[in-house]
């Protein structure tokens, strides 16, 4: 199933085409224009890179937050607008859940965090093993100190590394830096992206 996916939950925006767990094309922009200005040209570029036409697309996926209210609204509106003429199926994917797919090939405990200000983060925690992602808690807003205490207990009860991912990493990590077994993700796979949204959406489409 060829899926066109959109990610607009933060200042950067991205689009991707995925099929059967493979990324066919990916585009990313982080310039001082609104998502409403950049999204459609970016989608055209992504389809061109994948050597596809829109008629080849079989499903649309979009991140649904948490994140920027304006960005999420633009992304969802674009997804609905693209899907409606062909009656394509749509999948709304949690921004936090999609980031777990950045590490789908790494056995670890994945802690996704997005800055919610006032020493809080939007958060979800996942157990990843042999490519299977298991959610350990629902998406939530939580104080950084409380999350650090939770991860301390998790770290004590697993042999896996606990990896911090997301744009809230630098906000949260000082609260957890002294906990054994916790590390920050690298910059190259730290942030939300449309390719991971598409990979996560495939699971939603497969489940009906």
Model-predicted regions and their roles:
Residues 48-55, 84-95, 207-208:
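Phosphate-handling active-site elements
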Residues 185-208:
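Acyltransferase
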Residues 19-23, 76-88, 128-131, 181:
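A glycine- and small-aliphatic-rich helix-loop capping segment at beta-alpha/alpha-beta transitions
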Residues 61-90, 95:
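DPxDG-like acidic metal-binding loop motif
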Residues 1-64, 141, 191:
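N-terminal beta-alpha supersecondary unit
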Residues 34, 89-190:
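Surface "functional belts" at beta-alpha junctions
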